[in-house]
């Protein structure tokens, strides 16, 4: 076996060769190549004239001496046009019912069937056996067929509850294609002089029959780690809960796992990784509605769970909550406590400052910052005489926010613990304390928990960085995963600075 990374590099170069002269079809070519290398079938949905047949034709060049068969189905297509004509001589001389299959589907490695849903029952039934068992019954004999890739195409989906659903379920990968969108790509396509029938693949990159057969065995040896299985099961359970989710058969799940194994194998890995699960977005949908739903669910899985993003945020929330509780406890100990006076016959409770508070101007710290008068405030300066008068007689109280500017009117009160509390317009409060009696620095246990969480985040980010080198996954998905991990990291770092 070639070194895994050398194999991954070779498959990448092979795909690049196949993509030459095709615009905005890289993902389709790569998935077709993956399907061919793992012996799966795929369905291309899209309007006429968007290179569906050319994509299939190109895949022939991925293999040495591969034979291709393509056919446009109509309502009048007969099995003879797909599987070969009957041998008149065998029927006449020996009374044998036998087809001449040379040049037809039973002897082709790459098969492209356009307008597949127009095929009649006789063709569909034989095709199902060919896909399922890689066998073709030719008269009294059952022959193995060499088909590595079946690409079926149409500009429409099969009707629900029709006889076509069985065939549709066998097509593991489903791609919805559209016209070339980018202006530069459209211009390049119009002016390209490349012959579509030329072989763009160097001989050294083409896959031999021996390599193909060996790889089929090695793909099956790729492991499915427990944590990846848990993600798959989570997705399956979530889909089962959604009323509009498509039905996904156990057979489709099993075939999809082999595709994930192939993705890992041709990416140079010995085990399926969470990033491979993105391929399920092209395997589990049934129609336009379910296509969007499946993509949404896999996006949630990838950006919230695959690298423990949500789990780390939950842990962070618990740590921050505990830190806030400790800060509140500390605030209760260090807050400025005023003295309650007798005032039995007074209409309002009267207070005075502690005897050790003697400065003419008092700077009191907010235990947590508040936005007051459109300013983020961390401390307030009071004239001692004004504060004493307010404690004794009530009324209006003013203070300089952050010690600057004019004194502003404040919503100040004394709570049940005899602490001064200032409130913002939404009535959120912050206890006031004298300088030097503010909350202590972050407790060691909280700091340690945040450091452990940051270490776990770095491990998950390193795992993603290592696994994201996957030819078959679009870059925009990788970008969203990276952004989700960076968001978690930023929140952890912010908590460490509090």
UniProtKB/Swiss-Prot annotation:
The UniProt keyword set, sorted, is:
ATP-binding, Chaperone, Cytoplasm, Hydrolase, Nucleotide-binding
GO cellular-component term (any): cytoplasm
Which Pfam families does the entry link to? AAA_lid_8, ATPase_RavA_C, bpMoxR, LARA_dom
EC number(s)?
3.6.1.-
Q: How is its activity regulated?
A: ATPase activity is stimulated by ViaA.
Q: Give the primary localization class.
A: cytoplasm
Report the locations given in the UniProt record.
Cytoplasm
Example GO molecular function: ATP binding
Q: Which InterPro entries match?
A: AAA+_ATPase (IPR003593), ATPase_RavA (IPR023671), ATPase_RavA_C (IPR022547), MoxR (IPR045427), P-loop_NTPase (IPR027417), RavA-like_AAA_lid (IPR041538), RavA_ATPases (IPR050513), RavA_LARA_dom (IPR046898)
Positions contributing to ADP binding: 23, 49-54, 196
The family database entries (CDD domains) matched by this protein are listed as: AAA
Which reaction does this chain catalyze? Answer: ATP + H2O = ADP + phosphate + H(+)
Q: What is the similarity comment for this entry?
A: Belongs to the RavA family.
Q: How does it assemble?
A: Homohexamer. Interacts with ViaA.
In UniProt terms, what function does this protein have? Component of the RavA-ViaA chaperone complex, which may act on the membrane to optimize the function of some of the respiratory chains. RavA functions as an ATPase.
Q: Per its record, how is this protein called by name?
A: Regulatory ATPase RavA
Species of provenance: Shigella dysenteriae serotype 1 (strain Sd197)
Task: Name the gene that codes for it.
Answer: ravA
């Amino acid at each position: 076996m070639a070194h895994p990374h050398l194999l991954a590099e070779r498959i990448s170069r092979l795909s690049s060769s196949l993509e030459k002269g095709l615009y905005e079809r890289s993902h389709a070519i790569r998935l077709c190549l993956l399907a061919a290398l793992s012996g799966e079938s795929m369905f291309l949905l899209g309007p006429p004239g968007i290179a569906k047949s050319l994509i299939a034709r190109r895949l022939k060049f991925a293999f040495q001496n591969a034979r291709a068969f393509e056919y446009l189905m109509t309502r009048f297509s007969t099995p003879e046009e797909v599987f070969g004509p009957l041998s008149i001589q065998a029927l006449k001389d020996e009374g044998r019912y036998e087809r001449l299959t040379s040049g037809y589907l039973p002897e082709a490695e790459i098969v492209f069937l356009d307008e597949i849903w127009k095929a009649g029952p006789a063709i569909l039934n034989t095709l199902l056996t060919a896909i399922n068992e890689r066998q073709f019954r030719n008269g009294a004999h059952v022959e193995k067929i060499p088909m590595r890739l079946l690409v079926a195409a149409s500009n429409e989906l099969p009707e629900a509850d029709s006889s076509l659903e069985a065939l549709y379920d066998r097509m593991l990968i489903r791609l919805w294609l559209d016209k070339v969108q980018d202006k530069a790509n459209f211009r390049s396509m119009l002016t390209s002089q490349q012959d579509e029938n030329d072989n763009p693949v160097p001989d050294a990159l083409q896959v031999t029959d021996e390599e193909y057969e060996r790889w089929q065995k090695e793909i099956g040896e790729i492991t499915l780690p427990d944590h990846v299985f848990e993600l798959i099961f989570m997705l399956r359970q979530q889909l089962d809960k959604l009323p509009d989710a498509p039905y996904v058969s156990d057979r489709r799940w099993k075939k999809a796992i082999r595709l994930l194994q192939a993705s890992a194998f041709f990416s140079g890995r010995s085990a399926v990784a969470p990033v491979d699960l993105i391929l399920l977005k092209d395997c589990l949908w049934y129609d336009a509605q379910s296509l969007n739903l499946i993509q949404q669910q896999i996006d949630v899985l990838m950006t919230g769970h695959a690298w423990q993003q949500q789990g780390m945020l939950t842990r962070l929330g618990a740590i921050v909550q505990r830190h806030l509780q400790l800060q509140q406890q500390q605030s209760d100990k260090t807050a400025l406590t005023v003295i309650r006076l007798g005032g039995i016959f007074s209409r309002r409770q009267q207070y005075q400052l502690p005897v050790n508070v003697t400065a003419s101007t008092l700077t009191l710290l907010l235990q947590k910052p508040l936005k007051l008068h459109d300013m983020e405030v961390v401390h307030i300066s009071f004239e001692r005489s004004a504060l004493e008068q307010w404690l004794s007689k009530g009324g209006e109280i003013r203070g300089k926010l952050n010690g600057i500017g004019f004194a502003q009117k404040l919503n100040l009160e004394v709570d049940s613990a005899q602490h001064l509390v200032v409130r913002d317009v939404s009535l959120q409060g912050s206890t006031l304390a004298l300088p030097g009696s503010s909350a202590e620095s972050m407790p060691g246990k909280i700091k340690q928990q945040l450091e452990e969480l940051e270490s776990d985040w770095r491990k998950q980010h390193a795992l993603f960085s290592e696994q994201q080198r996957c030819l078959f996954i679009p870059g925009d998905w990788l970008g969203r995963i990276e952004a989700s991990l960076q968001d978690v990291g930023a929140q952890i770092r912010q908590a460490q600075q509090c």
